[in-house]
Amino acid sequence: MIRLTVPSIAQVESLAEIKSRLREKGIDVPLVADVHFSSEIAIAAAAVVEKVRINPGNFHKDHEKAKEQFARLVEVCKVNGTALRIGLNHGSLGERITNLYGNTPLAMKEAVMEWLNMCIDNDFYNVVVSLKASNTYVMTEAYRLLDKQMQEVGKRFPLHLGVTEAGNGDGGRIKSAVGISALLSEGIGKTIRVSLTEDPENEIPVAQYLADRYDNRLHSTMVSLTLEGKKATAVYNSPSRERLLLDFSCDFGKRLLDKELDEVVLKGTYIEEGNEITLVDSEYAAYLTDELMQAARRRFYRPEYIACPGCGRTMYNLESTFNVVKKRTSHLKGMVIAVMGCIVNGPGEMADADWGYVGEGNGMVSIYKGKTPVLRHVPETEAIDKLLELISQP
């Protein structure tokens, strides 16, 4: 599957050309159009590609018009055999929904159910659903609520899981593992994506690990577990550093999220490159435990970062910029800082952030305080300094 950003109606013609050239070469990988802020683009793309992703929060500004346009989209999908992903993000909930339910997991569930009910009314079931958030608690609760309601109404659409804007490095992997594994362990979810602000291929090993683990092809390397009330002591014998990190996250992320445990002590060994057995020392154990507690929203020892993986709308080096922002803000414990690839989705999808760095394109950046842009058209070369200046102001 290849997903392509489609920001304007003109790009729909490019989609058709891309598809034609691929098919001429005997490449039949399905194409997915990722569409935001335009129901007309979604309708046009549905006649070309195998799947269209829409976001209910920005499909159309007017709710009644959105329902009319969605009915048109469904008909085009039916005629062309096109699948549909209803992909809601926590940060882009519409004002009508948040006025009714707040900015909550319940609001996410209710928003998606409105659209699924329209699918049911139109006898259209070629649909997959996602309810992503950068907050693992919000993400897991939203999926649980939706899964429960779909069971109650007797219509279970497949769920695509992911923690959006998870960031990079160990933190991004741990956060993704915590959210996704909590749901997979409950039998919720059919497909997954691990979203990292890194080269895209780095997402695959983590996603493959999760798929293998919850399809019973892979098991934890934990060799012993001691429980004393809400404190757990776990000992591992892992074949690699990353395997230890992922096993630890999956074994205890859900229990921490659901407050079954309050503390985890990590011990054991892992194998470094060169087959050298390495003892998990107290410093590394504390680091992984801190990262896990932060990912599970139980204790914050550093800033919380929100960073998208980038897409066709990103016009700057997102990963390197994010790494610099992390380095220069590492002392701001508990603050939520977002680094987003584009002005199209960035402001909405970083709704939880205290501060945001959002690419505009053409070498310019917008800086946000909460949901409000406080500086626009800042040259990239100055933007991080400006962000830090603003943060330091009383």
Positions of the model-derived regions?
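Active-site-proximal glycine-rich helix-loop-beta segment
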Residues: 48, 229-230, 353-355
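Catalytic alpha/beta core domains of metabolic enzymes, predominantly
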Residues: 89, 96-332, 336-339
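Active-site beta->alpha loop and helix N-cap motifs at the rims of alpha/beta catalytic domains
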Residues: 1-115
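Beta-strand/loop-dominated core regions that host nucleotide or nucleotide-derived cofactor-binding catalytic loops
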Residues: 362-365, 372-393
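Glycine-rich phosphate-binding active-site loops on the catalytic face of alpha/beta enzymes
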Residues: 1, 48-63, 186-200, 260-278, ...
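Catalytic-core signal marking the mid-to-C-terminal active-site face
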Residues: 331, 354-355, 364-367
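Acidic, divalent-metal-coordinating active-site segment for phosphoryl/phosphodiester hydrolysis
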Residues: 344-349
